């Protein structure tokens, strides 16, 4: 309990200056219900941020909206929330972009070699710029949904293993590695000589304990919040292979039932607080890194030169990966243009 409270304090302190909209609406006789689905556990930084957002919206709406947050995959794993939104089974979700690639292939552009090992500011330039806007439009069109604002950072994904130490890229060869979804992660796993596996996050702890796979691709925050050291994780190779982003989505059916004032509350609360939310996620990742080390997980960081060399080696296959992942030439061009402009 003490650990969870300590981790939560990192996030809440980073959000201490969050904005609350001045706009409030009169209470409705029967509030509209908003069900939000997350697959991560309650102590995860995403859950803490979204819990704060929902409470702020609910307060500003003056009783017109009642929010319910379903955590730990109680309703759906993130891989299924796109379909759930389309079918009206939930009103809101904040999935990782990788969870949407089965419906929106372009959402997998983070896995392209050109973004491998990139810094946070570079990723923000891309997701806040034209590439991110193009994908957001597709999400809205294909899911029948509304993306309410800029995307929420998760952080850098790395390699983690149970029994085999990870001292270099070569140590990944032959390992069976779980990923969170999308053709790009599977391709990169194979490029490293490992065997890809896709398992929903709520099932990972048991699968690790049973030896279903030898390791996984995830973040320090996810390792810490789920306490995966209890499932056997002992080693990490921090190559910052891609920077995860969550997409805040509200179903279009629910959105259209909102008054203009309520729609404004949804977007303004997110817009006014996204920088603090991103800062809180970064703080959570930093603390999570210390936690996983304190739990005996050995972290190895490849050199900048090794990461750049690996990126260059993968770039030779970028066109093939884009075709395999069904990422459109328009997204690849927009991504290259955004990076060249920087």
Where are these regions (language model features)?
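N-terminal secretory/targeting leader peptides
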Residues: 2-5, 9-24, 28-125, 137-342
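Basic, amphipathic alpha-helical recognition segments used for DNA target recognition
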Residues: 131-133
